[in-house]
Curated annotation (Swiss-Prot):
Main location: cytoplasm
Record's protein name: UDP-N-acetylmuramate--L-alanine ligase
Cellular compartment(s): Cytoplasm
Gene that specifies this protein: murC
Pathway(s) where this gene product acts: Cell wall biogenesis; peptidoglycan biosynthesis
Length: 467
């Protein structure tokens, strides 16, 4: 039995969240009655309202009047008044991933998982399948520039979704094709141990049906170990590793992007195939690896080499993934969502490859718990930055932790050998600090999952105002 058409209204608590908004948009486009609430106004809330979805700002029991089902994310606390009212009225409550799983049952599905790179890889898979006239439905964890949204309803048989592992609910997703980009220590507040994280990813791959396949990056040691433990599912490996089934070769930086080729070797058939002259308008080895995963899926689904080349060259990227927000006196300002040490290191390396000038990192640590659990890694991931400007920790609802703050992070970076680290007093001071450090040809890279994106977009204008 699939999600009945008469179900509704479907009420989303926290409808403006990036994961929730995409599901709500697709359900609305399918003809379901959707409503919701959110703590504040946002671009996502406004976009959904334009589609005719009724959205309340603020959470209160009356908002759920008439709802047949409540959809909640893990960000919603157990004492939320709408959640309490739904349970008192015996209205079914489902997690975000459960509703996403219901949508996935309507199509054949590609689900992209991994500690980093999910959103970009999801966008790349969508772009390639779109170019191949497969017209996929897409639900992503970031705004796809080509769509201007994080979701679209396609008319084809395929759906492409980002599988968020943060609370373990990605194991509910019925994927026919699974991608695993990498597995690093993250979301330990939920999983408690890194072993539990690895077990979850193994289960994610083993959930793929026998007629499907998984695409896994064996450049990553943990993923390679997982590949060795999975016996009864078809695996296509990728990476620069010479043992990869889809091998990234001849990677070179070019005009702010990358050029490379991908060589395929079919272990069963003993055949080889190469797609050369690939151009990606994004810098960095990490993005080329993400593209290789997407190419592996597209190749397996029968897309032609020429279609893959054209789609990749035209890829418009994802908002908050190495996004240029402006320039000032020859200085380029970049906004990036990177908030884990592995992501930060990859982004700064891409910036280093993109300019002959200095790389100046502006970092807003995201969550006290993440900074605490990965403190050593944070103190060693800024090696490609000539200078690091450190803002206060963005709490994301967490209470402060003693000894885990901006100033201790600054001391940690210096103790680990970084030569130029500046403590930022507040966002209003950023333009003045940058103006004192940056010269023509330099890159200023704003990093974090909090409100630093607003600083990145305001910074070019604030610098110009300084003269």
């Amino acid at each position: 039995m699939r999600l009945p058409r008469h179900i509704g209204p479907i009420h989303f608590v926290g409808i403006g969240g990036i994961g929730m908004s995409g599901i709500a948009e697709v359900l609305c486009n399918l003809g379901y009655t959707v409503q919701g609430s959110d703590a504040s106004e946002s671009a996502n809330v406004n976009r959904l309202r334009e589609k005719g979805i009724q959205i309340h700002v603020g959470h209160q029991a009356d908002n759920i009047k008439g709802a047949d089902v409540l959809v909640v994310s893990t960000a919603i606390k157990r004492d939320n008044p709408e959640l309490l009212a739904a349970r008192a009225q015996r209205i079914p409550v489902v997690r975000r991933a459960e509703m996403l799983a219901e949508l996935m049952r309507l199509k054949s599905c590609v689900a992209i998982a991994g500690t980093h790179g999910k959103t970009t890889t999801t966008s790349m898979v969508a772009a390639l399948l779109d170019a191949g006239d497969l017209d996929p439905t897409v639900i992503n964890g970031g705004i796809i520039n080509a769509y201007g949204t994080n979701a679209r309803l396609g008319g084809g048989d395929w759906m492409v979704v980002e599988a968020d592992e943060s609370d373990g609910t990605f194991l509910k997703l019925p994927a026919d094709v699974a991608i695993v980009t990498n597995v690093d220590p993250e979301h330990l507040d939920h999983f408690k141990t890194f072993d539990a994280v690895q077990d979850a990813f193994r289960n994610f791959v083993e959930n793929v049906p026998f007629y499907g396949f998984a695409v896994m990056c064996i450049d990553h040691p943990v993923v390679q170990t997982l590949v060795g433990k999975i016996e009864d599912r078809r695996i296509i490996t990728y990476g620069e590793n010479p043992q990869a089934d889809a091998r990234l070769l001849d990677l070179a930086a070019s005009g702010g992007g990358s050029t490379f080729k991908v060589a395929f070797r079919d272990r069963k058939a003993g055949t080889a195939h190469e797609i050369a002259d690939l151009k990606l308008p994004m810098p960095g080895r990490h993005n080329a690896l993400n593209a290789t995963a997407a190419i592996a899926v597209a190749h397996e689904l029968g897309l032609s080499d020429d279609t893959i080349r054209k789609a990749l060259a035209a890829f418009g990227g994802v908002r908050r993934r190495f996004t240029k927000t402006g320039e000032w006196n020859g200085v380029t300002i970049i906004d990036d969502y990177g908030h884990h040490p592995v992501e930060i290191a990859a982004v700064l390396k891409a910036a280093r490859q993109s300019t002959a000038g200095k790389v100046i990192a502006v970092v807003q640590p995201h969550r006290f718990s993440r900074l605490q659990s990965l403190f050593e890694e944070f103190c060693t991931c800024f090696n490609d930055a000539d200078a690091v400007i450190v803002a206060d920790v963005y709490p994301a609802g967490e209470a402060p932790i003693e000894g885990i703050d901006r100033d201790h992070f600054v001391l940690g970076l210096r103790a680990h050998g970084h030569r130029d680290v500046v403590a930022l007093q507040d966002s209003a001071s950023l333009a003045g600090v940058v103006a004192g450090l940056a010269h023509s040809g330099d890159y200023v890279v704003c990093l974090g999952a909090g409100n630093i994106t607003q600083w990145a977009y305001a910074l070019p204008g604030e610098l110009k105002a300084l003269g």
